[in-house]
Amino acid sequence: MTEINGNLSAEGLNFCIVVGRFNDLITNKLLEGAIDCIVRHGGSEDNITVVRVPGSFEIPLIAKKVAKTGKYDAVICLGAVIRGSTPHFEYVAAEVTKGIALVSLETEIPVSYGILTTDTIEQAVERAGTKMGNKGFDAALSAIEMANLIKEIR
């Protein structure tokens, strides 16, 4: 039996982080977490490109554009969609989720999902580096592992 696993070394890997500016109190913390993860796992800030977009809804398009350049081993998507009193939350959350999944499938580049979808700002804060860890860090960790796994399979 053969088992293939991706390792957690970011050394020599190139990343693009696509981050929404909307709810930047949260998304900036997610970005800090993602960069921290890459550096802690042997990556270099010189191998990280950050692209800021207006909000989470715009993330899939730019993720696809950067993935198609062939410059990056993985794309990390970071954003925060916080429920309001309208159905807008459901529409945005669903479309962003579908869009990010499609980008990965269409480009065959790992695209990690670091989009917070929470009911309150407090829940978002908890997931951006306080009680519940930092989901930006988690998304970067997934991107590192998947980039290495793809290299192993190729």
Curated annotation (Swiss-Prot):
Keyword Transport: no
Catalytic activity: (2S)-2-hydroxy-3-oxobutyl phosphate + 5-amino-6-(D-ribitylamino)uracil = 6,7-dimethyl-8-(1-D-ribityl)lumazine + phosphate + 2 H2O + H(+)
InterPro entries named among the record's database cross-references: LS, LS/RS, LS/RS_sf
Pathway(s) this gene product operates in, as recorded in its UniProt entry: Cofactor biosynthesis; riboflavin biosynthesis; riboflavin from 2-hydroxy-3-oxobutyl phosphate and 5-amino-6-(D-ribitylamino)uracil: step 1/2
Gene Ontology BP terms: riboflavin biosynthetic process
Protein EC: 2.5.1.78
Binding site for (2S)-2-hydroxy-3-oxobutyl phosphate: S85, T86, R127
Residues engaged in binding 5-amino-6-(D-ribitylamino)uracil: F22, S56, F57, E58, A80, V81, I82, Y113
Subunit structure: Forms an icosahedral capsid composed of 60 subunits, arranged as a dodecamer of pentamers.
Entry function: Catalyzes the formation of 6,7-dimethyl-8-ribityllumazine by condensation of 5-amino-6-(D-ribitylamino)uracil with 3,4-dihydroxy-2-butanone 4-phosphate. This is the penultimate step in the biosynthesis of riboflavin.
PANTHER family referenced in this protein's UniProt entry, alphabetically: 6,7-DIMETHYL-8-RIBITYLLUMAZINE SYNTHASE, 6,7-DIMETHYL-8-RIBITYLLUMAZINE SYNTHASE DMRL SYNTHASE LUMAZINE SYNTHASE
Family, as annotated: Belongs to the DMRL synthase family.
Listed name of the protein: 6,7-dimethyl-8-ribityllumazine synthase
Gene source species: Persephonella marina (strain DSM 14350 / EX-H1)
